[in-house]
Amino acid sequence: MTAEGPLAPEDRVLDREAIGRLCVSLIAAEQQDLLREGRVGHHQMIGARLLTAGHPSPDDLLIDEDTLGLDSLLMLSLVTRVAGFFHLSDSNTEDYLLVRRRLGEWVDLIDHHHTLMGPKARFTFATSGSTAGPKPVTHSAAALLSEGQAIAKILTERPPEVRRVLSCVPAHHIYGFLWSCLFPSRRGLEAKQLANLSASGIMRHARSGDLVVGTPFIWEQFADLDYRLPGDVVGVTSGAPSTAETWRCASALGPARMLDIYGSTETGGIGWRERRDDPFRTLPDLACFHDTLSRLGRRLDLQDEIAWDKDGGFTILGRKDEILQVAGSNVSPAAVRDILLRNPRVRDAAVRLDGRRLKAVISVAEGADEAEIEIELRATAARHLPAPARPDRFLFATELPRTGAGKLADW
């Protein structure tokens, strides 16, 4: 299972700095789950710890109960997450995470794992399932490196030259991994993780030669800023479908190039474009035969229906399933509806997308206290649903709105 002989630095999938960013991102994700359950405090979050105590070196950060609020059982859960992401069991190194308690020691251990595994390394990402639950998806280092080369080709085919990466998305998501970890590692570029900063804070970091990695939701957060990017900045958006508002907000910032990437956790990147009205072009590393796409011989099953044009470009027609994307997360309207129907005073409910958030229409008995029911529903949603899956707007009616044909109508 391991590579033959030591690897040269240029043959490794990730550099040490990228491994560190991934570890921080995985720890933060584990803590976010615990924070929602009230088991850790905001002051114990790894992001806060790295910004306090005189700005200690990240390598010296202790991964323990006193520092990050992780007791022995919570440590087991974290170790399982980190070991599973990097597939440390392939090199029999996963148990060392339990005895090494500094962030730098974890990074060194994972770096050693990659030295042993080489191109046989594997990574497991989780889909952004907000309601149905995340699903693990494993990708080989070879496939990820192939896509990384495709990204580099797209970015270097014309100016400006990218000299640094600013990422506004979590590093352990496949989009963040490819663009803010693998790509800069392979090109020898500096990368900064800014996912926890405000929109204005992100913009203050930008300088000429940067690649800014965001989602449509993030780019639209810049709309209210009276700000223009420095010259020669490239923007990229993915994680959810871009809209006219996404492109308007991004264009107002004045990037030299703006890339829209289509793909998923299951497939990796599939297509890209630089203008909203253009069709997507397939990434350079993909093979297409009879409208079937593959990467390194592995067929890629798309979650959307697409239409091909005569020049080999494609347009996305819509999802094959009933999943919506909200702020970069997959949301099942049916699952949200089931949560709302737990209230005994709700006779029926319907949920759909309303701009960037969800809206719900609630059927209640005539004369029911709608304000009181809305308070109850918002409390239920807060307890049982992550933020992207919580309806932002409620409308009440005695019957759900329907068309003359009996189909559910918009409201």
UniProtKB/Swiss-Prot annotation:
Which molecular-function annotations from GO does this UniProt entry contain?
A: 4-coumarate-CoA ligase activity; ATP binding
Q: Does the keyword Ligase apply?
A: yes
Q: What class of enzyme is it?
A: ligase
The cross-references to SUPFAM superfamilies, in alphabetical order and at most eight, read: Acetyl-CoA synthetase-like
Q: Which Pfam families match?
A: AMP-binding, AMP-binding_C
GO biological process entries: phenylpropanoid metabolic process
Keywords per UniProt: ATP-binding, Ligase, Nucleotide-binding, Phenylpropanoid metabolism
**Per the record, what are the reactions this protein catalyses?**
(E)-4-coumarate + ATP + CoA = (E)-4-coumaroyl-CoA + AMP + diphosphate
Entry EC no(s): 6.2.1.12
Domain of life from the UniProt record? Bacteria
Q: Which InterPro entries would you find in this protein's record?
A: 4_coum_CoA_lig (IPR012743), AMP-bd_C (IPR025110), AMP-bd_C_sf (IPR045851), AMP-dep_synth/lig_dom (IPR000873), ANL_N_sf (IPR042099), ATP-dep_AMP-bd_enzyme (IPR050237)
Main function = Converts p-coumaric acid into p-coumaryl CoA. This is necessary for the activation of the photoactive yellow protein (PYP) chromophore.
The UniProt similarity line reads: Belongs to the ATP-dependent AMP-binding enzyme family.
Q: What is this protein called?
A: 4-coumarate--CoA ligase
